[in-house]
């Protein structure tokens, strides 16, 4: 049947109860119709999907934003799913389509059970990216959806990532946004379903800037629906008429007597789901899902990282006080599946971090919900649902790789779990199995913890040197101390039987220290110790300064000579002379060099700050600067501060700067991508102050970097500037340690980049210097204890030359040598920390 004849027949249907005008696509064989009674009601015997609450960091708003995700019945990470992004109306929220009358999850459950659609995932964002109904929020939400939410979903759920498995639909304001986002991003969406579109709908010439050419070529389904009594009917009708005039295939459905409410929106969704399914949304993409890699049982397994689920009530929840994620709203009979758990030579105990206001049981079964029972954790009350504690139980010995089922016999919140696994016969600490415990094993553990080369099987079991049931930075610290002979046995070896190694390990003695300088001890501990330098000093204007610099430090960084105004004082005129001199000094003295900094809101030349830029022209300036500078120093600078001090001090988004104000919120993504292209081997850092401990600004930067990693932005590390005031408390120092550890969990290196500890001039120097020494020592110990911390750079080394008095009146003496080049107590304290004291 020709399209012309088909259209004529459909016009005849206009006399029916549901007024219908359709210009049909060949991929949509069915016609819209009113759904049967009970289509949106929970039915007995119908498997139910799960609706989970999520939060993600948005680069558009520089904040954490909420959304909800519908996972279909039987959701499994072994399968791939298509995704519908379903938008709410003005003044609404991410809850409306599930709890505000929409019942989208129930509609989908029933359609899946009837075989009318294949299982898919539905995501309901909060579209108020500036504020409810605020116009700027429309543009912000587009960036939020495309640059943050979609990448988050694709990183955390088993979904297809191509346009032909992605749809967008919405009601009222969300209908207008479906038009706007869908039709102007046809490289992202093939199925678009505006229902009762609101006045925020773009004009036709903006929706179809090419006269409809892309829509004709790329659209798999454009479904437009509205009620005949809806005062907003004209907005969808306008688009419909344009499509008719320009031969754009679409479906236009009017519900006779329908208003602006869920009596139209739910039938619209019911039809859109089926027509999108028929048009190919949920077709098999023929993309095989790889078999999950075995997960070692003795590592910490996050509860939310399950591979299968049977429950519609379980939700991913926040875990106080750390702010992580866990599983809650569990009911009796629910179970979670964790595939390919490697129990190694034998697991004999189970440990979980749980919260429970009452008591309940968790059954541990293998390879099925009714499979072999290996143990039961009797969960004791922790007092309330927000108080978590570790609880353990013994289990029957289990070996090899099995699927684990946690079968719940009552409510409980669970953060993570792990198993106690017997150690390998080749001995703790001998990660490469060569019979020796030495720096090669330490490097292997460091690469594992950084996510560069994950350990598996026997090697991972041997890495648990403190026998805690997980492999983390504590094991790195213990192994390092063992290799340096600070300790002579691993924790627990005196009271826990360890199998005799087949080859007796020969312990490597502490590395030979070729001198007595800080750099000698730092090299033995595997870290770099450095200082910033200003041009006159590495130009040998002060011989004493120069002598200390080359003797004590293994890394240098220009204080000012490699900032934008110094390197490119006039557009396209670069001056590398001073930076090159420091590099030559470093190379002569066996030092490494950090690059500081490519992008900053300060110390920019006037031609840049006063220029008449638009987004594209300023991006070109940015790319040219980063590419030219990094290419000049390619292979010679090991760490680059790509961007410096970009977060507002409040933590509420990026600070105002020429980069943010002209390019937009995504300018950092471009900067890091340009940097990686210029020098693929350099480590790329974001550097900032007041982000060392846990707090609003620190949390904002962490969430920003985590989001960048999830989106594939090539960032390797974060620089903690560490400009401190003397007298840091143990609690404050512990907070720094916690912050470093959370970066390790997402595979991010931490460098201490600009350390100084300023002292109030009113304090007694003798007492203050000792407090300062203790603070420096604790900072070094924190860095040594964390394998993702390998750089310890001070912002100068002598109180004779420091920026502090001129910037912080009433403060001084921040460094480790006094003004006469005498080592202060802080110098010796750092050395003691490096020696393991």
Swiss-Prot record:
Pinpoint the GH10 domain residues. Answer: 512-833
Disulfide bond annotation, renumbered to this chain: 783-789
The record's CDD domains line, in alphabetical order, gives: CBM6_xylanase-like (cd04084), Dockerin_I (cd14256)
Q: Does the keyword Signal apply?
A: yes
Ranges for domain CBM6 come to: 299-420
Reaction catalyzed: Endohydrolysis of (1->4)-beta-D-xylosidic linkages in xylans
| UniProt protein name | Endo-1,4-beta-xylanase Z
Recorded source organism is Acetivibrio thermocellus (strain ATCC 27405 / DSM 1237 / JCM 9322 / NBRC 103400 / NCIMB 10682 / NRRL B-4536 / VPI 7372)
User: In the record, what lineage is assigned to the organism producing the protein?
Assistant: Bacteria, Bacillati, Bacillota, Clostridia, Eubacteriales
